[in-house]
Amino acid sequence: MKNYTILFPGQGSQSIGMMDSFSTNTIVKSTFDEAAEHLKKDFWSMVALENSAIHQTENTQPIMLISGIALWRLLGSLGINKPISLAGHSLGEFTALVAAGVISFTEALDLVTQRAKLMQSAVPDQVGAMAAILGLEDEAVVRVCQAVQSDEVMEPVNFNSPGQVVIAGHRNLIEQSLDSFKEAGAK
């Protein structure tokens, strides 16, 4: 295999059933079991079953780390040469650090769990929200955010890729603005 780099994803790329193809793989399952034992939480059921808990920050962040390390370990078991570099998008940086041997898996689980708790506590429950806006140019997302501003706040906070911008702010304003984004051409 030629030289390659692995980029581990951040929060927002999770989905129910995302690990279904690996449900019988012992390496993947043992990685989830290791995390479950360390954090006393069954993350496998959140990715395998219809469980909305996968979208709660306190679960999503460990799930993304666990999934990334499970696939990293699986890749290593296949005898494929190691990548020339590792990187992570946002939360994925922790996965890259574990894969590079900088920190242990359990250290990363503890750090990511604390990170998720801090992020969740930064905004009172049910006050804030985030949404990924797909299919619009960055400038169009900015314009819609500015057009719907009121006493509440909503801003683009993460320009993930062309056509994918994450907005964050007051939950009510985000929910009310979704139609405006669709009218502007969002999917």
For the regions a language model picked out, list residue spans one by one.
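Short, glycine/charge-rich beta-strand/loop segments that flank catalytic centers
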Residues: 51-52, 87-91, 116, 128-132
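An amphipathic alpha-helix/helix-turn recognition signal
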Residues: 30, 63, 90-91, 103, ...
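Hydrophobic side chains within alpha-helical segments
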Residues: 64, 70-71, 96-98, 110, ...
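Alpha-helix C-terminal capping segments
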Residues: 74, 78, 97-103
